């Protein structure tokens, strides 16, 4: 399944629910994406909008895109949300729902998407 199909699937009212820690309900999404080598600039340009808008969501702690320094066609989205409710709210946004259509012709293969919870972190 490609990123576009996965994004479209999530926006089609599929609930992604994960058992959360009572002590720390934070959730992270790690999405690894392979992009067609000649489409990396277009992909980054398309990603900027979802990054900017997602970072303004009340429940989003951060939403960033990283690029593999050894293979410029490989990218990783790293997202952190305050809880499951924030993840669900993100999946319901127009910018999330529209992202799949924007990148459908840019991706080279299936995405690897993981939703994880925080197991331990430094006390502040």
Which residues fall in each region the model found?
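C-terminal motif of bacterial Sec signal peptides marking the signal peptidase cleavage site
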Residues: 7-9
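Sec-dependent N-terminal signal peptides
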Residues: 1-3
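Glycine-rich beta-strand-turn "strand-cap" elements at beta-sheet edges
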Residues: 11-28, 65-71, 101-124
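Short, glycine- and small/hydrophobic-rich beta-strand elements in well-ordered beta-sheets
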Residues: 52-76
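An amphipathic, aromatic/His-enriched active-site/gating alpha helix that lines ligand/cofactor pockets
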Residues: 53-61, 80-114
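Mature N-terminal segment immediately following signal peptide/propeptide cleavage
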Residues: 27-44
